[in-house]
Regions:
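A short SAM/SAH-binding and catalytic strip from SAM-dependent methyltransferases
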Residues: 96-109
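A C-terminal cap/extension of S-adenosyl-L-methionine-dependent methyltransferases
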Residues: 171-251
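Short alpha-helix
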Residues: 149-177
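A short acidic, Gly/Pro-enriched loop at the edge of an enzyme's catalytic core
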Residues: 86-97
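Conserved class I S-adenosyl-L-methionine
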Residues: 1-32, 45, 124-150
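Class I SAM-dependent methyltransferase SAM/SAH-binding core
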Residues: 37, 42-87
Length: 251
């Protein structure tokens, strides 16, 4: 029997855990002067945390009702476009980073959506989805709770194979290891919950298409240290001779 489509009511389920995992996975991406496109932003719950973490944001959503909710939640200046994940009205390499939220996307539509996301992404792509190869999913199926699962889902290895065919380095992480009936009990977010094993109910895959660049450089440490402030030109003689330069005698 086919599963019912996900309800927008379930988009906030386990939101702190999922947001913490997403921000942890996107942490290596540089922010300064870079733009992130969120495909399928839904009701916009994810937009404020991404904006607060330093990304310049753009977003798109198919549903008019969800677009209106996203506009109310989005930070000032964030554009919410009307676009389908499998056809984006953007030129190639229009955005540095792309986040494709496949939480409410039917599995059959994922290959076309990934193709479009990779087309408009210049440096990296992240994919979020509900994982059917997880203990919570199996528990939910055994108890027959077909009406309670928060979104469309697919096995982890299916999403991995689709992204592994693209050039770049692939990373994975997941959260929500407990049965779905325990997600409503508001747990504290710990680092242990952000597992790099892809067997939780909600997964994030990150594809880095370009080599990672360094961020703000650390201060250089000069050895031996100067005991007093001196002009930079004089330090070269100290480094080569090991002795401080002779002081000039003024008449």
């Amino acid at each position: 029997m086919p599963l019912p489509p996900p309800s927008p009511f379930h988009q906030h389920i386990a939101l702190p855990e999922r947001t913490a995992l997403l921000l942890s996975m996107l942490a290596p991406w540089p922010r300064r002067g870079r733009e992130l496109l969120v495909i399928g932003c839904g009701a916009g719950h994810v937009l404020p945390p991404l904006w607060q973490s330093g990304f310049d944001l753009s977003a798109c959503e198919t549903s008019p009702a969800l677009r209106e909710q996203a506009r109310r939640r989005a930070p000032q200046g964030v554009e919410i476009e009307a676009a389908s994940p499998d056809w984006l009205p953007f030129a190639d390499n229009s955005f540095d980073w792309v986040l494709l939220r496949a939480d409410e996307l039917p599995p059959a539509a994922l290959p076309a959506a990934l193709s479009e996301a990779c087309r408009v992404a210049a440096c990296g792509l992240a994919l979020t989805f509900w994982n059917s190869a997880s203990l919570p999913w199996l528990t939910w199926r055994l108890h027959g709770r077909r009406h309670a699962w928060p979104g469309h889902c697919l096995p982890f290895w299916t999403a991995w194979r689709l992204l592994a065919a693209r050039p770049g380095r692939l990373h994975a992480a997941s959260c929500l290891w407990r049965p779905a009936c325990r997600w409503h009990h508001g747990t504290h977010v710990h680092a242990a919950a952000l597992s790099r094993l892809p067997f939780g109910a909600w997964c994030v895959l990150r594809l880095d298409m370009s080599p990672r660049r360094t961020g703000t450089p650390l201060p250089l440490r000069l050895r031996p240290r100067l005991d007093t402030a001196r002009p930079v030109m004089e330090y070269d003689s100290l480094r080569t001779t090991g002795q401080p330069p002779a002081q000039k005698q003024h008449p």
